[in-house]
Amino acid sequence: DWSQRKKGQPFFAQIQTPGGKLRGKNVEGWNKIQATVEKALGSRTSSNAVRLPPYYPRHPDIVQDWAAYLDSVRMTDVMVGEVIARLEKEGVRDNTLVLFMTDHGISHGRGKQFLYEEGLHVPLIITGPKIIAGTVREDLVEHIDIAALSLAAAGIQIPQYMQAKNILAND
């Protein structure tokens, strides 16, 4: 918790949210996250609102899993929003590099364990000083690159043996 640092001292915080893991792996888990979301946000994603990719059958279990996934994304958005609000309240938001990412793509039917697009597409959103809002890059990024970026942001030289690159470097 960065609140214990000296005033003006730089900090590094890695905050993990449960994300899609909130939804569980079965009907019981799906119902639980949807009830939590409904209590917290006043509504849950309706099965009727779910738009599946064309290669998924519109089976009730798949639709409910997808709805629960969408609700877990909504809860993640709230959690991330709370962190951003705290940074703003403490007056450090404009001078803080914030990275948002997941460890894998959507884990529906085929997504996580096989080489399907939804499992390979991993979000990475970066905001902070010198980051132009709305910029979209097509770079191939590996999770190890986040370590290199973090070291560089802290002014620490990236070791030569590290198989990573600072994705924000000019080169």
Positions of the model-derived regions?
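Active-site-proximal cap/lid insertion segments
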Residues: 2-147, 151-170
